[in-house]
């Protein structure tokens, strides 16, 4: 938030010049505005339900009680922190959690003092929905206004960097493409560990040596200093911090971790100790990921089952008529966390022994495949029973395709970061499949490329990416000739 950002010194050590004479007032205005929205939405809901703006005594008590709970919850949640550089969705999730907490406290209060006998539940429900919509709309408009101001050069923080390494160049490129973040990287102070000039690619000016940093800060307006040095240069970093003790300003460490095989890296604080998460899946990364992905999977799986059950029944009859054996083929696969589960398919091959250790993918003109099974595999209809895996929770609609258990044993020794694909649930379709990496992988480089797409999906996951993959599956994958 703009108002919280202007008063960032409330939460972090910062330069006195950041403390605009309006910042404290602006923060107070935002807090009062949020509380006013809570009360106003209650009055509007009362007007809609009862046709008057003047609430009866029990409703006035309910509004006053909820206002008190709002003060408590809005203070406990990080609503008024600096959201600079963070997405709007993250802010709205916190807002929703805070407002949900308000009404959770009100619900407990109502049960204890039996408010439900005096207050309409319809009014409470309308109040909650209206209040949440109003707060979300207000924050969205405020964020849009803030972004517009920053693209015009207003409320932009100036940053200098000690050291010029790959992470800094990546951030510099990001900031140049996203002016709404409101940060301007002014230049860097050179160190022996910097990138070669040929690698820099961008014209960040050199401001001198680290010895000149303090003098530069005295003569120029700078809001943040970033330190980008190798992790092994602990003494050098400590020396820089000691110099900066003489000049209070925000200081950030930009560690160079790009060679560590990162996956969804983030930072957090446990107790009073800062911790960097180097590798984590969606489950550990974000509660939003867990809830949104689970809801999406269950809803789409139920819809698919309701719409496709006649086709699945017809396929089951066709499988039974094509060759002796069961309708479904069940095979051990590795899923979330590398745990084994049984994946279901319509059987497309003649019954054979699948318990050996030899890795044998289906190949072109494979004699094990029945004629009807060949049609199922080309059209990907053999994958439909995996809807039951999704409903059971062992798979997702979209995710890295689960490989046979023997493949994991084989490829984890040959491909770096191969097992990182198990940070999420496997999917019926995936990012690699819609990009042409489906079916047989006769060469190691083909499998490596598939794994790259799997990890890229985990890093980039969003609901929109899942929808895109589902659409592309229908357009590109169904009938693809690489499936035998």
Curated annotation (Swiss-Prot):
Alphabetically ordered keywords of this record: Cell inner membrane, Cell membrane, Exopolysaccharide synthesis, Membrane, Transferase, Transmembrane, Transmembrane helix
Membrane topology: Multi-pass membrane protein
InterPro entries: Bact_transf, EPS_sugar_tfrase, Undecaprenyl-P_gluc_Ptfrase
EC number: 2.7.8.31
Pathway(s) per entry: Glycan biosynthesis; xanthan biosynthesis
Residue ranges of the TM segments: 37-57, 59-79, 93-113, 122-142, 299-319
Signal sequence segment: none
Keyword Cell membrane set for record: yes
One Gene Ontology term of the molecular function aspect: undecaprenyl-phosphate glucose phosphotransferase activity
Deletion consequences: Cells lacking this gene fail to synthesize any xanthan biosynthetic lipid sugar intermediates. They do not produce xanthan and exhibit a 50% virulence index reduction.
Record's subcellular location: Cell inner membrane
GO BP terms in the entry: colanic acid biosynthetic process; polysaccharide biosynthetic process
EC class of the enzyme, as a word: transferase
Reaction(s) this enzyme catalyzes, per UniProt: di-trans,octa-cis-undecaprenyl phosphate + UDP-alpha-D-glucose = alpha-D-glucosyl di-trans,octa-cis-undecaprenyl diphosphate + UMP
Domain of life, source organism: Bacteria
Gene Ontology CC: one annotated term: plasma membrane
Function: Is the initiating enzyme for the synthesis of the exopolysaccharide xanthan. Catalyzes the transfer of the glucose-1-phosphate moiety from UDP-Glc onto the carrier lipid undecaprenyl phosphate (C55-P), forming a phosphoanhydride bond yielding to glucosyl-pyrophosphoryl-undecaprenol (Glc-PP-C55).
Family the entry assigns: Belongs to the bacterial sugar transferase family.
Record note on domains: The C-terminal domain is sufficient for glucosyl-1-phosphate transferase activity.
The protein's name in its UniProt record: UDP-glucose:undecaprenyl-phosphate glucose-1-phosphate transferase
Organism per entry: Xanthomonas campestris pv. campestris
Lineage: Bacteria, Pseudomonadati, Pseudomonadota, Gammaproteobacteria, Lysobacterales
Gene this protein is translated from: gumD
